[in-house]
Amino acid sequence: MRIGVLALQGAFVEHISKLRKLGVDNIELRQRKDICENLDGLILPGGESTAMRKLLIELDLLEPLKAMIAEGMPVFGTCAGMILLAKEISDGDSPCFGTLDITVKRNAYGRQLSSFRCKDRFLDKEIEMPFIRAPYAERVDKTVTILAEHDNKIVAVRQDNQLAAAFHPELTDDMTVYEYFLDLIEKRSLM
């Protein structure tokens, strides 16, 4: 199994560390030539979504990655990655990939100083959830499965091959969300 990690900005190093601990081969995606045919999945890390969107366009990564996601490549977006995947952004910003049928509210939990950690349920397991200038989903399509909520706000979802979390599982010791993503990849490879 080989997973590409978008490595333009944000918490990509932490995602790579998690993948290594799980024994998963990975490649940093920094430019178009880094995209290879033998990728089984993609991670879009947290960071600053506007800067990431700009770099995706400038480096000619947006369209090929969007096509891969549309063709069924499993993708996992955290925080800014959730915003990049969202079909709609409630503050009027243009969507980036626009492949995940949700509406997100950017910086919904306030500024950097308002960042926090909590424990909440991801599916049937309580896990630590670090929120850093995090979004949440205000609306989800009926085809979207809600995987986690915090204070009645939707903070993790799945739609087909797409997984998104408003929090940063890469900043904890828990592997639950990564194991869920790897399971998603394995099930897809059996199809």
Please place each PLM-identified region on the residue numbering:
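N-terminal beta1-alpha1 cap of cysteine-dependent amidohydrolase-like domains
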Residues: 1-58, 63-68, 175-179, 183-191
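Cysteine-nucleophile active-site neighborhood
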Residues: 49-120
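Flexible, charged surface loops at secondary-structure boundaries
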Residues: 35-38, 70, 140, 158
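Amide-donor transfer/coupling interface in amidating biosynthetic enzymes
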Residues: 106-191
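Redox-cofactor binding/interface segments in oxidoreductases and associated redox assembly factors
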Residues: 43-44, 77, 165
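Hydrophobic anchor at the start of a short beta-strand
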Residues: 26-27, 75, 162
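A secondary-structure boundary/capping signal
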Residues: 8, 78-80, 100, 133, ...
